[in-house]
């Protein structure tokens, strides 16, 4: 009984349209940021290094290099703070988790583009 109600509520909250993306893809995530009374969108562009598919609890981690420092941010896929996700380029990788990119820098950290 309660399980069906929970599933129905989760289905309503998961109604947001999310583009298909995978680890290795370069994405631009538009995040809603509230500063005092104002609310604006902030873009976070980087490589998806991991994805967790758990229905409403799905999440993904994006890594970028900002002024020589590696920055990683984990987003909840269906969070109301995530405004939009745009796939900029597809990456050709063989692993599901790209945590090895944390140890690489410069040209070694590049990902080959998927030609389809």
Swiss-Prot record:
Gene Ontology CC terms: cytosolic large ribosomal subunit
Pfam families reported in the protein's UniProt record: Ribosomal_L19 (PF01245)
- PROSITE patterns found in the cross-reference section: RIBOSOMAL_L19
Per the record, the domain of life is Bacteria
Return the InterPro entries for the record: Ribosomal_bL19, Ribosomal_bL19_CS, Ribosomal_bL19_sf, Translation_prot_SH3-like_sf
SUPFAM superfamilies, per database record: Translation proteins SH3-like domain (SSF50104)
Q: Name one GO biological process term.
A: translation
User: What keywords does the record list, in alphabetical order?
Assistant: Ribonucleoprotein, Ribosomal protein
Q: What molecular functions are annotated in GO for this chain?
A: structural constituent of ribosome
UniProt-listed NCBIfam families:
rplS_bact
Its annotated function is as follows: This protein is located at the 30S-50S ribosomal subunit interface and may play a role in the structure and function of the aminoacyl-tRNA binding site.
The family annotation for this protein states: Belongs to the bacterial ribosomal protein bL19 family.
Q: What is this protein called?
A: Large ribosomal subunit protein bL19
User: Which classification does the entry list for the species?
Assistant: Bacteria, Pseudomonadati, Pseudomonadota, Gammaproteobacteria, Pseudomonadales
Q: Which gene encodes it?
A: rplS
């Amino acid at each position: 009984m309660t399980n069906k109600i929970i599933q129905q509520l989760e289905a309503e909250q998961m109604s947001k349209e999310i583009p298909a993306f995978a680890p290795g893809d370069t994405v631009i995530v538009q995040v809603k940021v509230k500063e005092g009374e104002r609310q604006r969108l902030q873009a976070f562009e980087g490589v998806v290094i991991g994805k967790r598919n758990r229905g409403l609890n799905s999440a993904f981690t994006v890594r970028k290099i900002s002024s020589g420092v590696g920055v990683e941010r984990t987003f909840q896929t269906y969070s109301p703070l995530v405004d939009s996700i745009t796939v900029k380029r597809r990456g050709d990788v063989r692993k599901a988790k790209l945590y090895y990119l944390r140890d690489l820098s410069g040209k070694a950290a590049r990902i080959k583009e998927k030609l389809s």
